[in-house]
């Protein structure tokens, strides 16, 4: 029996890595979104006791945290569409590329969700005491959101090439 490199690259377990990439993109981004939502909501709840008129204005961090989960959903669906069976030509390098794409999107989303949660909590509480802090909070939230967006862009490049 001879060793054939083309057959070795089409290992039967190669699609497992592709599916793990899709799963990790969804799981980690949703964990980040959940943390960001929960942490920001705690700040909104405590701020709402003192200044209930600012509650609707302070919902922005919660919305931005929810968008992080959508990034993971988009990447997971793109990766899911690219994974085929090993007999159809799905190789290990494609599987590892899809795993890297999923981890990139997922971990960037996790970090972005943490950042949005911390900034949202502190920013909402600070805005209740000093309304001029609102613009600064929004700017920092945008920079935090962009971390997740960068992860999605890199994941889409990795997953489709």
Swiss-Prot record:
InterPro entries: ATPase_proteolipid_c-like_dom, ATPase_proteolipid_csu, ATPase_proteolipid_su_C_euk, F/V-ATP_Csub_sf. It is a multi-pass membrane protein. SUPFAM superfamilies: F1F0 ATP synthase subunit C. The keyword Transport applies. It comes from the Eukaryota. NCBIfam families: V_ATP_synt_C. The chain crosses the membrane at residues 16-36, 59-79, 99-119, 138-158. It comes from Ascaris suum (Pig roundworm). The record marks 145 as: Essential for proton translocation. Belongs to the V-ATPase proteolipid subunit family. Its main location: membrane. Residues 1-15, 80-98, 159-161 are lumenal. Residues 37-58, 120-137 are cytoplasmic. This is V-type proton ATPase 16 kDa proteolipid subunit c. It is found in: Membrane. The keyword Ion transport applies.
